[in-house]
């Protein structure tokens, strides 16, 4: 489950760039 944290961070950062 800890492996999904970087994916969530990258997804949030990608959404914030929109």
From Swiss-Prot:
The UniProt entry lists the main location of this chain as secreted
Query: What GO terms describe the biological role, i.e. biological process, of this protein?
Result: defense response to bacterium; defense response to fungus; innate immune response; killing of cells of another organism
Q: Name one GO cellular component term.
A: extracellular region
Q: In which tissues is it expressed?
A: Expressed by the skin glands.
Compartment list: Secreted
Annotated membrane-spanning segments are none
What are the protein's UniProt keywords? Answer: Amidation, Amphibian defense peptide, Antibiotic, Antimicrobial, Cytolysis, Fungicide, Hemolysis, Immunity, Innate immunity, Secreted
Q: Does the keyword Amino-acid biosynthesis apply?
A: no
Give the source's domain of life in one word: Eukaryota
Query: Which parts of the sequence carry Leucine amide?
Result: 18
State if Cytoplasm is listed as a keyword. no
Family the entry assigns: Belongs to the frog skin active peptide (FSAP) family. Medusin subfamily.
Something else known:
The primary structure of this peptide is identical to that of Medusin-AC (AC L0P329) and of Medusin-AS (AC A0A5Q0MU22).
Q: What does this protein do?
A: Antimicrobial peptide active against S.aureus (MIC=8 uM) but inactive against E.coli. Also shows fungicide activity. Also inhibits growth of B.dendrobatidis zoospores at high concentrations (above 25 uM). Shows anticancer activities since it is cytolytic against HepG2 human hepatoma-derived cells (LC(50)=35 uM). Is strongly hemolytic on human erythrocytes (LC(50)=40 uM).
Q: What is the protein's given name?
A: Medusin-L1
According to its UniProt entry, this protein's organism is: Agalychnis lemur
């Amino acid at each position: 489950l800890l492996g999904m944290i970087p994916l969530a961070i990258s997804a949030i950062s990608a959404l914030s760039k929109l």
